[in-house]
């Protein structure tokens, strides 16, 4: 059996795409007007930094009203408890007063949740990839606002021949040359897909880079070459 080195090298190479392990499109949970977008596209941010702030005057006013209702319900409950102790009213009135307090407290919890939603904070360290809206723009609930990318470990997505499964497994080393900068990076197979495409006879795989290379960016592409020789019988 004669196999050229060129054929062997071609069989062990495949295209890859660099992706971020943390990437998200953030949407609004409320309908409101944007008053601030502190982090612009391309800028870095830290976990818990404010990414978008909404005009919260309506929700703050709602919370104040509910807080006043809760305070009033608590006063009524206390008064009825004192009257019940003197047997001026029955236990039924006290129970109704307690129900009113519980209801007002639940409404206050909802109001506070709405005010908390007036600020979108960064879930992790990263960079602002895209901004789909502008300051002073009114947006609707569930409307996509921004796209963020985490600054954590990057990975490479690739498709491999299903025939490679006879020798390829998790932890297998590979070398990746990136098209955009011509640099070579070391990585290893991190995960293999759960099923094989019946048409192309390929399977998805994920490779993790051996360290956090500063010259790598999500969206870069390149060629992966597996370092070890293929065993052929």
What are these regions (language model features)?
Residues 151, 170-186, 214:
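Low-complexity, intrinsically disordered
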Residues 55-64, 152, 157, 183-187:
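Short, Lys/Arg- and Gly-enriched loop/turn segments at beta-strand edges
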Residues 17, 31, 35-38, 44-50, ...:
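Surface-exposed patches in structured soluble domains
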Residues 2-31, 190-191, 220:
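N-terminal beta-strand block that forms a small beta-sandwich/beta-barrel module immediately after a flexible targeting
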Residues 115-118:
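A conserved signal-transducing helical linker
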Residues 129-130, 184-230:
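Structural microfeature recognizing short secondary-structure transition sites
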Residues 58-113, 131, 156, 200, ...:
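Alpha-helical coiled-coil segments
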Residues 10-13, 121-122, 178-186:
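Short coil-to-beta-strand transition motifs
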